[in-house]
Amino acid sequence: MTAVQRITVLGATGSIGLSTLDVIARHPERYQVYALSGYTRIDQLLALCVLHCPAYAVVPNGEAAVRLREGLAAAGCATEVLEGEAGLCEVAAAPEVDAVMAAIVGAAGLRPTLAAVEAGKKVLLANKEALVMSGALFMEAVRRSGAVLLPIDSEHNAIFQCLPGDYDRGLSQVGVRRILLTASGGPFRETPQADLADVTPEQACAHPNWSMGRKISVDSASMMNKGLELIEACWLFDAAPDKVEVVVHPQSVIHSLVDYVDGSVLAQLGNPDMRTPIANALAWPERIDSGVAPLDLFAIARLDFQAPDELRFPCLRLARQAAEAGNSAPAVLNAANEVAVEAFLERRIRFPEIAGMIEQVLAQEPVVPVPSLDAVFAADQRARELSREWLRRHGR
C-alpha cells in the first residue's frame, strides 16, 4: 500500500488551492494536509483548517495571526499559526513534507516555491511567475536539489503528458518539432477592438470556460496569461521561444499539443477543470480519480482553431519579445503586468492601457543579467517603480 503523502498547499484559499484540497479529500488513504497558507481570506482559511486539520497554517502578518489563532482556539483546532514569508518557506521546506502545491499568485510565491525546490520536494507548480521571473536560477535549483517539478497549468501539464519520459535529453533528441500551446482567446476574443477601452473588470473576470481568480482572469482576457505560459514552457521543456506556437482554441478541450518530426501530433483532451492536472501531478506517475466528469465528445461536436491576433492582444507580442530577450526582461514584464492588472481592477486604467504601460516599462528598463535572486528582485522592484510612475502620470 502507498504511504500517505503529506502535502503543503501554498495559496490554499485561491481557486487552485481549493481544487487541490477537493482532490486530496477524495483520497484520504493517500494524502494528508500538512500545512495551508492564506492571504486575505482568513475566515475561509479557518474553515479549511477545521476541515483538514493541518499541523500549520501561514498568514501574512501578526494581525491575521491573532485573528486566526482566536478562531482556531474557539473551534478546538490544534493547528499552529506561522507568519510571513519565513513561515511560508518553513512549511514548504519542512522535512515532514512530501509535496508542495505552489499556488500563490505572482512574485510573492517565488521565495517559498524556491524553498520547496531547494529542499528537494515534489513541487506542483501553479505559480508560473516563479519561472517567468527566475527561470535559469529556478531550473538550476531543480537540477541541483533533485526536486521533482510537475506543472499544474493545464497547458503545461498537457505538454508534459504528451512528451516522452526522457524529454530532458532535449526536444530535438526525442523528435519534437514544436510545442503547440492552446489558448481560449478569453472573453474578448470577438469583442470589436474599438470597444475594448470600455470593458469593465467584471467583464474581464467572466471567463467563458474556466473558473479562476481575478488576476489570472484579467491576464487571460489580455492574453498576457498565454504570454507568461509561453515563457514558462520555454523553461520547463528547455524550448526556444520560436519552438512554442500559440493556437487559439475557443472550446478549451484540447489543452495543448506536441508536434513530432514524423508527422504525429499528440494532444491531451479533457473538460476544462483544474482538478485534472492537479490529480495528474499529485499522483504522478500513477492516475487517480479527480472528480472531473468524463469528456463527452458528442456533446462537444466540434473543435475550432485560429491564429492569435497580436494587434488585439499586444501582451502576447510583448511576452514573446521578453522571452527572446531573456535575462531581466521576463521579470520586468511580470512586475509591470502585476501593477497594471491591479490598477485595471481598481478602475485606475482602461483595459488597453495594461499593454501600453507594460510596453513603456519594458522600453525604459534596460535588459541586464540576473545571476542571483537578489538581482531578480531588484529588476522586479525597478519595474514596479517605473509602473507606479507611469500610473501617476496617466492613471485616473
Swiss-Prot record:
Q: Which SUPFAM superfamilies match?
A: 1-deoxy-D-xylulose-5-phosphate reductoisomerase, C-terminal domain, Glyceraldehyde-3-phosphate dehydrogenase-like, C-terminal domain, NAD(P)-binding Rossmann-fold domains
The entry's 1-deoxy-D-xylulose 5-phosphate-binding residues are 128, 154-155, 184, 207, 220, 225-226, 229
Binding-site residues, NADPH: 13-16, 127, 129, 213
Q: Which Gene3D superfamilies match?
A: 1.10.1740.10, NAD(P)-binding Rossmann-like Domain
Q: Name one Pfam family in it.
A: DXP_redisom_C
Keyword Membrane on this protein?
A: no
Pathway-wise, it operates in: Isoprenoid biosynthesis; isopentenyl diphosphate biosynthesis via DXP pathway; isopentenyl diphosphate from 1-deoxy-D-xylulose 5-phosphate: step 1/6
* First-level EC class: oxidoreductase
Question: What GO molecular function annotation could you give as one example from this UniProt entry?
Answer: manganese ion binding
Renumbered to this chain, the signal peptide range is none
UniProt lists the family membership as follows: Belongs to the DXR family.
Catalyzed reactions: 2-C-methyl-D-erythritol 4-phosphate + NADP(+) = 1-deoxy-D-xylulose 5-phosphate + NADPH + H(+)
Q: Which gene encodes it?
A: dxr
Q: Which residues participate in Mn(2+) binding?
A: 153, 155, 229
Native source species = Pseudomonas putida (strain W619)
Keywords tagged on the record: Isoprene biosynthesis, Manganese, Metal-binding, NADP, Oxidoreductase
What this protein is called in its record is 1-deoxy-D-xylulose 5-phosphate reductoisomerase
Q: Which GO terms describe its biological process?
A: isopentenyl diphosphate biosynthetic process, methylerythritol 4-phosphate pathway involved in terpenoid biosynthetic process
PANTHER family in the cross-refs: 1-DEOXY-D-XYLULOSE 5-PHOSPHATE REDUCTOISOMERASE, 1-DEOXY-D-XYLULOSE 5-PHOSPHATE REDUCTOISOMERASE, CHLOROPLASTIC
Function field:
Catalyzes the NADPH-dependent rearrangement and reduction of 1-deoxy-D-xylulose-5-phosphate (DXP) to 2-C-methyl-D-erythritol 4-phosphate (MEP).
Q: Does the keyword Metal-binding apply?
A: yes
